[in-house]
């Protein structure tokens, strides 16, 4: 199967002022993220706020340049790409944002907003653009006669359908969805998720699905990447990870996810405190101050990602969770 997105040791660091006469500090928002994504597959990226999910999204969509590492889109290395090549790469990777209303122009009719990618990137006539836009509107569950309406005339779920339609107009190879359902009512979330999956099946688009909701992720993901303070904590097939997570942080996230039929035999794992200050990350494992299983080794030695039970995990004591 075709690999459409490859990241190798992707990092993004920011220089932050510490105040007058104190110089600058470095925030490692993204630190050594690697993965491969095939056409028609979904990689879910999960973690708490501040773990680097949105920074990864901005790097993948070329909104920001990574500090180091390699990023390939459809086999094309981003670093060193020419202006024309970058233009094509941006066509190949599109994004759906968390707040659909904020990503739409309130003064422009949605038909014109959906046609804009075609106007910029193709030589289609006005009538051909209109026809393609109305066809896409039908595919996302919107009525073509709403072509002349403005964003404020639609519900939240309809606006997210509009945002998704706009992202799919150029039939990208990769779609990055940053919390696409978190601003929607629960009753609408399932409809939008099913629409994502229908379009993926039709166009064989690869998804990078960013979310903090593991119940939603379970519905859509083929593979899951769990991040903590900019680093991968655990990554592997979704069924394996949900069946038996091997990193204490993943176990805690799943333990906190509401379930219709909870398993009383599984102990509840509660993590204390907040994410550490990224300006002053802890020594050793970044999670050790909140981890109920931490040992002296965790406080002094950074765990490397290693292969264990068909997934990668960054924990010194992951073997104790095998079973």
Swiss-Prot record:
Its EC number is 7.4.2.9. It is an enzyme of class 7 (translocase). GO terms for biological process: peptide transport; protein transport; transmembrane transport. It is found in: Cell inner membrane. Its main location: membrane. One of its GO terms (molecular function) is ATP binding. The keyword Cell membrane applies. ATP binds at residues 47-54. Keywords: ATP-binding, Cell inner membrane, Cell membrane, Membrane, Nucleotide-binding, Peptide transport, Protein transport, Translocase, Transport. The complex is composed of two ATP-binding proteins (DppD and DppF), two transmembrane proteins (DppB and DppC) and a solute-binding protein (DppA1-A5). Five orthologous SBPs (DppA1-A5) are present in P.aeruginosa, which increases the substrate specificity of the DppBCDF transporter. Part of the ABC transporter DppABCDF involved in the uptake of various di/tripeptides. Is also involved in the uptake of phaseolotoxin, a toxic tripeptide inhibiting the enzyme ornithine carbamoyltransferase. Responsible for energy coupling to the transport system. This is Di/tripeptide transport ATP-binding protein DppF. It comes from Pseudomonas aeruginosa (strain UCBPP-PA14).
